[in-house]
Amino acid sequence: SEKSLISLTKFAEDNGSFLFSSPGDFSSLNLLRRINTTAYKVSSGQFTNIAIIEEMIKDNIPIIFSTGMAKEEDIERGINLCDKNNFYNFALLYCVSLYPTSSQQLNIDYINHLEKKYNVITGYSDHTIGELACLAAVSMGAKIIEKHFTTDNTLTGADNALSMSPENFKKMCENIRNIEKMKYIS
């Protein structure tokens, strides 16, 4: 509901973060506009929804594209659409849309392929269990990490088993910061 989104947005801001979401239709997009979202995410299933992406571009706020179910030509079409509209405030997240994703299914080097081929900010949308794939992605240059979050791993749901508890999420973030320190001399 709109009230819930407003509450979540305030909670995120109060904790030094921000809320963004993947609108699947124009009604959801307009709801995000009303709450003054600071970014949009295009889920991999929406990558070919040109009309909604064009509408997002008009708002001139960051767009994060997830590539999970997108083919290479879909990615190129999305980037060309941004190019055509002189919009360059976007990133591509590498993703494997399997719940959960095993290490053998990852091909995490694809992050480097996306960055080199398209010369854009890249990240990783994770569906593995644990933090290892996220840490590997950061060590390979991912600038954005998306990881599912839960307060209770015993709940039912397609993504709950691979979601992180608050404690594990905090530890993952600390490990990411340590990797960043190892990579860059300030």
Predicted regions and their residues:
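Catalytic cores and adjacent flexible loops of soluble metabolic enzymes
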Residues: 1-186
